[in-house]
Amino acid sequence: QAEPQKVCDQAIKVSKELLKWVEKGYEVITLTASCGLMLKFEWPLLLPDNEDIKQLSKKTKDIDEYIVDISKKEGLAKGIGEIDGGVTVHHACHARAQNMGNKARDMLKLIPNIKIDVVEKCAGHGGTFGVMKGSHDVANKVGKGASKIIIKKNNKYMASDCPLAGKHLKQLEQDTNISNDEALHPIELIAKAYKI
């Protein structure tokens, strides 16, 4: 059950803390698509007159968006290598809702000679929807379409800019005995390319 007042109270509290860093010249970098969507779009919709929330939303970037931006402005650190086996990137719903383009794919293109396939179907997870007993079967049914595409692409890696969606899709893949590696966040593949 949604609790908008609790969300608003937390948004006010958290935005005040994060703005201390923004005022020092930092940007807020989110590691998951759902967090980015919340800070950039949902909090401003819930609290449209709150100046702290407005300022924070303008200074927030998704990690994939941030790395792509750095690569364009300053370039990447030397030492990025290839990754064999290809990757299927699940472009999560919460990332698509941010209207920033597919930054996970764009970031992974920074890896030399990488084969990338993209899936833009809902994973079905939807936060707690995918784990609650009463809705888990529906979440699985919704995610089957994306899972089938991932299985068909048969890449070594599967990555999603939403870790929960990635894990949900991985669970659906395990139900079919596919043998690709664990579900990763795209930034983990960048780390792998740097041998970190």
Model-derived features: positions:
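Iron-sulfur cluster-binding electron-transfer modules in prokaryotic oxidoreductases
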Residues: Q1-I196
